[in-house]
Amino acid sequence: MKDINSVTVIGAGLMGSGIVQVAAQANCKVTMVDTSDAALGNGEKLISTSLKRVARKKFDGDEQQQKAFIDKVLANITLSKSAEQAVSEADLVVEAIVENIDVKRTLFTNLDKVAPEHSIFCSNTSSLPISDIAAATSAARQEKFAGLHFFNPVPAMKLVEIVRTNAVSDDVFQSLQDFTTKVGKTPVSCKDTPGFIVNRLLVPYMFEAFRVLDRKEASIKDIDTAMKLGAGMPMGPFELADFVGLDTMKFIVDGWAKEGKIEPALVQPSKSLDDLVSEGHLGRKSGKGFYDYKK
Ligand code: 3HC
């Protein structure tokens, strides 16, 4: 199997731009794709802010080395508004677009026709079954179609889940493990099950925290403090929910409830969360969630 050196990332949002950044830092040639100049510009901005942070830490006090590092990483990144053109030489295609199965399936059906035969296709979905997305491609591609699930903030979080469907070949799985290690992350593998490993455990825990609040058993602040100081979490469940996005949290659990593959008690909705989402309070990105960030 060919080494992964050329990567195309579809989606320039928080996750997509983070994946572009870590691949470019690992010296891969990366094309970042989105549908508008504004979306690509936003992705570039996220990368340059994060790169400055990484450079400052790597070359503390040496501005020249910091600049050389940033320039070298940025030189590995190309922007494109055409996914079809951008995959023409890709060893790996990673999709990080909206969590909509039809949109993802249409994208991959189109890319399957134009990408090189050896290209590995991956989705960074956190909530949709990989095999349902992969089924939109040819049988040959399904052997090269896996989940590659990064965590937010991508440049800082050290884990990648490689989600292996029954169709994925050993060679492809090995290539993805090698790529994950090359970009400085630790891979774990799991079957194509709801939430994979991290979200399967993390999301029900967070929802129970929301329901503790619904039942007025403890305050947001006290639950967060308890989990940080009593369980060693870097963020409490409400801080983390605001960080991930309340709409995302709701989308994941509503999807699981509909699928019916998870114990119903674990996917009980939370009134506090539902109310905030319906009022447009989605967490940090909208300025308010469980906490108010405008103050
Ligand atoms: N770019 C580059 N580096 C970053 C960064 C960024 N955007 N954000 C943080 N970092 C680095 C910092 O430079 C620092 O590095 P160091 O330890 O080597 O010095 C390290 O990360 C810690 O950052 P800070 O000291 O500035 O801040 P904190 O100690 O408060 O850490 C945090 C910030 C890493 C976000 C930490 O609070 C954390 O780990 N929170 C939990 C995040 C989490 O659980 N993410 C997973 C969410 S679930 C998910 O993504 C799945 C999805 O499918 C829903």
Predicted regions and their residues:
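NAD(P)+-binding Rossmann beta1-loop-alpha1 motif at the extreme N-terminus of oxidoreductases
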Residues: 1-53, 114
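NAD(P)-dependent Rossmann-like dehydrogenase/reductase catalytic/cofactor-binding core
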Residues: 2-3, 26-28, 170, 174, ...
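Rossmann-like NAD(P)-binding element
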Residues: 38, 53-60, 65-121, 128
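Hydrophobic/aromatic beta-strand patches that form the interior of the parallel beta-sheet core
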Residues: 31, 78-80, 94, 146-148, ...
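Amphipathic alpha-helical segments at domain termini/boundaries
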Residues: 5-7, 21, 25-27, 71-92, ...
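A general alpha-helix detector
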Residues: 158-159, 205-209, 236, 252-256
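Rossmann-fold dinucleotide-binding core
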Residues: 120-191, 199-200
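Acidic/polar active-site rim loop that often engages polyanionic ligands
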Residues: 25-28, 35, 153-162, 234, ...
